[in-house]
């Protein structure tokens, strides 16, 4: 049923440190739900969330990124079980220098079974990390629970985030159109023309998916 599927491969959501708002925690649940229901993967970046136990000055205590990570995992599990299509993917990202990084790395797979975890890293973050953090990260990678993602910036110095496959870096709510042009039905003499027309169609489509 292609009419109900999204014409994109993956997308990115950077969660702001607020329950409400267009890019807040609650908005991210809706965003992730829509992506998973319609077959797109989504990379959820949680580094802006306050660490576990942090006070906001209004009598509220933060529960931390890992606690919210469990909601995304449960959301993915329920949607996969209830939907006809079961091809959504959800990856949680956290910067290496976030105060809750060790908890993020060492949380048992049984507590986050329906999401992948990825640590955003660069040379500076690695050099500044404690030995405990480095050891936990290396063990997490060896166990298959943790993936690595390089932090990157666009030409204007604005940070862009890795999507699910880590091949494309996007701003928050950006979409990746990792598609293909099938030229199997073309004659050899029509391959060039078919490729150009196919790419033009994909470019037109991509502008409608943001």
Segments predicted by a language model, with ranges:
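Extended catalytic cores of very large enzyme megasubunits
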Residues: 1-210
């Amino acid at each position: 049923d292609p009419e109900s599927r999204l014409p994109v491969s993956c997308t990115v959501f950077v969660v702001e440190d607020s329950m409400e708002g267009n890019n807040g925690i609650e908005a991210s649940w809706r965003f992730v739900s829509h992506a998973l229901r319609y077959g797109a993967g989504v990379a959820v970046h949680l580094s802006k969330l306050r660490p576990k136990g942090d006070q906001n000055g209004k009598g509220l205590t933060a529960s931390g990124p890992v606690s919210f990570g469990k909601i995304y995992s449960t959301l993915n599990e329920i949607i996969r079980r209830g939907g006809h299509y079961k091809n959504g993917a959800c990856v949680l990202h956290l910067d290496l220098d976030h105060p809750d990084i060790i908890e993020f790395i060492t949380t048992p797979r049984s507590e986050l079974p329906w999401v992948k975890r990825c640590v955003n890293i660069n040379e500076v973050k690695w050099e500044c990390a404690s030995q405990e953090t480095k050891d936990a990260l290396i063990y997490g990678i060896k166990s298959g629970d943790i993936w690595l993602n390089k932090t990157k910036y666009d030409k204007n110095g604005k940070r862009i985030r890795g999507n699910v496959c880590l091949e494309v870096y996007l701003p928050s709510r950006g979409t990746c159109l990792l598609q293909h042009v099938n030229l199997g039905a073309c004659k050899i003499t029509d391959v060039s023309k078919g490729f150009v027309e196919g790419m033009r169609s994909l470019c037109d489509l991509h502008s409608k998916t943001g």
